[in-house]
Amino acid sequence: PHHLEFDRLFGKNDTSYERLNKAREMAIRYHIIIVLKGANTAIITPKGDVLFNSSGNAGMATAGSGDTLTGMITGLLAQGYHPIPAAILGVFLHGMAGDLAAEKDSQEYITARDIISQIGQAYKKLHNYRV
């Protein structure tokens, strides 16, 4: 969820720090993975580990973007990925696809369809990456 959705689910938080701590608490209590969407999307594991994503941009705060992310993560689960790696890879690829969409046009005009259209290129870029 994004911050407003999270607050509706788990109660209002006055700061992002408070929200992150509440997300850790909820992930541990309910043994769930929480993907807290935002400028640096956080993935919180059932053990309370917090991982921050480095890909993505402000233009991705658009209708349908979260649905696209959910579809990407569930698609990875359907392929046999374990839940935590599926969340991490899904969030990163989603952000990378958004970055590619922004490079192609402009982050001010990104739609969910633009993100979807760049998923293949994001995979290709990731496969070609060398450490």
Predicted regions and their residues:
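Conserved phosphate/ATP/ADP-binding segment of small-molecule kinases
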Residues: 1-50
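Short, small-residue alpha-helix embedded
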Residues: 8, 62-93
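Short, well-structured alpha-helical segments that form the helix of a local strand-helix-strand
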Residues: 19-27, 83-97, 112-120
